[in-house]
A protein has these predicted regions:
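Short aromatic/hydrophobic "clamp" motif used to bind/position activated sugar donors
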Residues: 56
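Conserved donor NDP-sugar-binding/catalytic core segment of glycosyltransferases
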Residues: 68-104
Length: 268
């Protein structure tokens, strides 16, 4: 386990908790990397540099692994060790933060938003991997580098696009984790605006990348897109932005989101 503290309440503010965990014997080895406030990309890259295992997986401090998360993903990867990565499903948890100090919050709703089998053209268009859902080979970091320091947002999307250029990913259709999004409309709008601003920046970086495909692989991609009857799907983020910014639709957003989540589960 590698724990990177990005600033926190002063450098090494988590040291006591780490030492207590070490002394408990619950984990064989814990690597603690305290940093001054440096940002997500620096913290993620430091974690990858410190990691020594063959497989890696990220976990932000407000996300949650279920007890079988790593077991499910590792077991699937062992069946096909040539895969660059495997990823599972995750609940998006709408969270109402009542207080940050002390930390008090309420989980408002769980929704299953992303259920997309691996498809490169779709990934080139928009991200459908919550960051904690992906278990990947560390050699991808060694071969392709880590997070792009120019991106303070959508850095994970850029990482997965680069890692998947020469490596296949595979979906494991089981929910094994959760991630949080703000419940308050104002915070949701602010968050979406930031992501929208970074989309063009991340896309511009992707346009400089090159991918090598065989003729059968190109044919397969064309057939898949044709079968879907779309060039590339309209991103969920765009639809969400339209709904939230339309007063008549705004009040229907969360009920519709819940209904769609239930309908998807029934259909599957």
């Amino acid at each position: 386990l590698v724990v990177v503290e990005d600033g926190g309440q002063g450098v090494e503010s988590a040291k006591a908790a780490i030492e207590a965990l070490r002394s408990s014997g619950a984990l064989a080895k814990i690597v603690y990397v305290p940093l001054p406030k440096s940002g997500r990309c620096v913290a993620g890259n430091k974690a990858l540099e410190a990691a020594t295992g063959q497989l890696c997986c990220f976990l932000d401090d407000d996300d949650l692994f279920y007890a079988d998360h790593l077991e499910v993903l590792v077991s699937e990867w062992l069946k096909q060790p040539t895969l660059g990565a495997v990823y599972s499903l995750s609940y998006e948890v709408r969270t109402h933060v009542q207080s940050e100090e002390p930390w008090v919050y309420q989980n408002v709703m769980h929704s299953l938003i992303h259920r997309q089998p691996f498809h490169r053209p779709t990934l080139w268009h928009h991200n459908y991997f919550p960051i904690q859902t992906v278990l990947f080979q560390r050699k991808l970091f060694e071969e392709n580098g880590g997070f792009d320091l120019d991106l303070e947002n959508l850095e994970d999307w850029n990482l997965w696009v680069r890692y998947s250029l020469k490596n296949d990913f595979k979906l494991v259709p089981k929910v094994t984790s959760t991630y949080r999004v703000p419940d308050q409309i104002e915070k949701a709008l602010q968050r979406q605006a930031v992501l929208d601003n970074y989309y063009a920046k991340a896309k511009a970086k992707h346009d400089l990348l090159k991918v090598e495909l065989t003729l059968p692989e190109i044919q397969q991609i064309v057939e898949e897109i044709s079968h879907q009857n779309q060039v590339v799907g309209v991103p969920t983020s765009w639809l969400k932005q339209v709904v939230i910014r339309t007063p008549l639709l705004r009040n229907l957003y969360h009920p519709l989101k819940k209904w769609v989540s239930i309908w998807r589960r029934i259909r599957r």
